[in-house]
Amino acid sequence: MSCPKCGSGNIAKEKTMRGWSDDYVCCDCGYNDSKDAFGERGKNEFVRINKERKGNEKS
């Protein structure tokens, strides 16, 4: 599981005043969303961003 925003694997379950929520938070950039966002959807987004960066580096 990795952050869809920054790609970090430093992910934790978010805690609220009432206990644990169903959301996850990136401990590096602070992005938070549901587990689905950090799962396959997040992985696909990270791959897309990396491809764009590599394309820009070649230019």
Swiss-Prot record:
Q: Output the superkingdom of the source species.
A: Viruses
Name by which UniProt lists this protein: Eag protein
Q: Which organism is it from?
A: Salmonella phage P22
Taxonomic lineage: Viruses, Duplodnaviria, Heunggongvirae, Uroviricota, Caudoviricetes
